[in-house]
């Protein structure tokens, strides 16, 4: 069956997902750029803020490192490293401290055994495997007939659903890390009240990128279900 652009209205679902992702990405980049220009009153760098937050939470086995790139910051629970990017590591801006605090939030989650983080970590190998073979299985299934066709399509969709679940479980993980960041920055005095307000705006914008990503995945899954069900009805 031919699913060309002019005959397949479900491309609209993909387009909506792309637009949502682009808007969210643009918003977080703009907000980060704005608060990257504002020097924090404390004058702490992102690295110093991260190290202090970790110590405040009794975490002494996490290494704060530098990583190249822009907004490539992340916490790796496998080797307990907290990597801060070029605009964060040595920067004294409000944005840098906010991002560093957010990544520390993930380190604290790991330290405390935060369940959603553990679930997300367990899904990683399945998602990595599924992302490689889900679409090939579905495409092969669409060109076949009979029970084998349905079997391949169902397995492909199931693997894609795992990827959707991964994006959904990421939402509470990221939101919780941001809440921890805002709380510690306010309670520690590392940032003034108006500076914490800037961090809230930045982390809220960052959270929307994960919301947009999850929405895009759900829309792709919906499109898959519509196309495969339509194909089965025509068999």
Segments (PLM) and residue ranges:
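Post-HExxH zinc-binding segment in Zn-dependent metallohydrolases
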Residues: 124-149
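Polar-ligand-bearing catalytic/cofactor-coordination segments
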Residues: 1-5, 25-130, 165-235
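Membrane-interfacial helix-loop-helix connectors in multipass membrane proteins
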Residues: 2, 140-155, 227-235
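Hydrophobic alpha-helical transmembrane segments
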Residues: 6-14, 148-158
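Short hydrophobic/aromatic-rich motifs at helix boundaries and adjacent loops
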Residues: 18-24, 152-154, 196
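N-terminal signal-anchor transmembrane alpha helix
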Residues: 10-34
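Alpha-helical transmembrane segments of multi-pass membrane proteins
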Residues: 17-23, 141, 159-170
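Residues within membrane-spanning alpha-helices of integral membrane proteins
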Residues: 14, 131, 135, 157-160, ...
